[in-house]
Amino acid sequence: ITAATATLAARMLTGQHYPIVCVPTDYETEGLWPHKAADLFCVANESMAETLRPRKVPEESILITGIPTRDDFRRAYDRPSVREQLKLPQDRRIVLALAGAYLPRPYVHFRTALDKLLPYLHGFDDTLHFVFVAGSDADYARHLRQECEELGLANATVLDYVDDMAALMAASDLAICKSGGLTVTECLCAQVPMILLGKAYGQEKVNVQMLTSLGAAMHVTTARELLDTLRHVAKYPESARAMLINGSFLRHPNAAEDIANATLRLIAAPKNPGDPRYRKHLLHFYWGKKPAHIR
């Protein structure tokens, strides 16, 4: 939001002729950053394009690309080989819990729900194996390992920071994660179904609504709901496969490449000196139409 606004202001004040491309990383068009003077909006889906049109963004400035991810999320992985490298069982469905974060505060409730889940994991011994990714949080990793050891869990693995997350996701059958735009997009591209854990607000709430309305994810807010959902998925594996199929509607594995190509085309295109977007001016005010979506 800050970058888009500041960059547009700089171009207005200086009159320089450089293209501005906005790439939102959630499934919602926020109210503060869209500005019709931007040259291109690369959005995740048609719903986002629909919110830009009342803001008088011209159709030629809207491109539905999906949300970009790293290139390794486009690769095909040998699941048995990845599992062997990580010492994960071949005969169980892998449930990946993404609990690591640079800022642990947003994950407090998420981790609390996982802690409450741990004593019940014995009930999935014959079906599911759980992989908890603690990231760079050594204290949390130590806590998880101690809990798993005290509970005698044979179907749980705790990992620290994982360099090749795309490979781990591709080797998994289900992910438990928060509803951040980049996280859910990586899961979509890695073709791993999702259980979105925790209450969601702002853009993340829209991410939840988008994914669950399409049947591409399940949403739970408490440890009890999480346990019930896992029992359902363990009993009916077809439900996870259905999420995978429905998620293909939102999957854009080539988004980063498409955005880069669109940006290069803008750079190469001749600039019209008379274009009001490139004229030096102090401010610009315009009044849009009725919003497509209200929240």
Locations of the language-model features?
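A short alpha->beta transition loop at the rim of the catalytic pocket in nucleotide-sugar-dependent
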Residues: 172-173, 191-193
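Donor-nucleotide binding loops and adjacent catalytic segments primarily
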Residues: 81, 89-171
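C-terminal amphipathic helix plus adjacent low-complexity
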Residues: 237-295
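A nucleotide-sugar donor-handling region in carbohydrate enzymes
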Residues: 39-102, 135-139
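C-terminal "capping" alpha-helix adjacent to the active site of nucleotide-linked donor transferases
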Residues: 213-214, 221-238
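Active-site and donor-binding regions of nucleotide-sugar-utilizing enzymes
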Residues: 1-56, 61-64
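Acidic donor-binding loop of glycosyltransferase active sites
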Residues: 170-179
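Short alpha-helical segment that forms part of, or immediately flanks, the ligand-binding pocket
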Residues: 166, 184-190, 209
